[in-house]
Amino acid sequence: MKTPPFNLFQPKTIEEAIEISSNFVKNDEQFDWIAGGTDLLPNYKWHLNTKPNVISLASIDELYRLDSKHIGAMVRLHDLANSEFSHPIIKKAAEGIASVLIRQSGTVGGNIALDTRCFWYNQAEEWRRSIDWCHKCDCDTSADCRVIPNQNELCVATYQADLAPTLLVLNAKIHLCGPEGSRNMPLSEFFELDGIKRN
C-alpha cells in the first residue's frame, strides 16, 4: 500500500523543529513527528490517523546523544541495546524489542511517544466506517468506545511501547522542548490515563 501524500519537514535544530510545529499549531494545521518511523509509516500505509504534515527529527544531531546520563530521542534501539553506557536492565529491555531490523530503525523517542491503540482503532478506515466511529477517532459524532460499549466516556486504547516500563522502574526523567521553553519531568508524569491523547 502507498502512503497518502504529506509534506515532509526536516529541521536541522531543535529550535527549527519547534518553530515549524508552532506555525502548524497557530494555523490550526495537523502534523505528526517522525523519528525512526517503524510505527508511524505502517500506520500511514494503512491510512490510520494520517496528517498532511510530518516533521522528521532525523537531521537534528543533538538528539543522537547517548551517554551514562542521557539517551537522546533519535538513539536507535539497536544502539541502546549495545552501548557500554546503557544500564544493564535497559540493554535487556532494548534487545527484546521487536526484530533486529526494527531495532535498527526504531528509536527511543519514537518508542516512548508511541500512540495508544486498540483492536478497533487499528483497522483500515473502511472497516471502522462500516461499524461506527469511536472516542479516539473523534469525528464529531456522539461516538462510543467500541471495546467497552455503552459507557460513552472512557477510551481504553492502551499504550504498547516496550521501553517505558523499564525507564519508569529506573525513575527516568524526560526532557521536553516547546515554544514556551524546555523542562524536565519524571517519565511517570508524561503518561496520562487517557487512551485518546497521544503522549
Report the location of each language-model feature.
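C-terminal structural segment of proteins
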Residues: 1-199
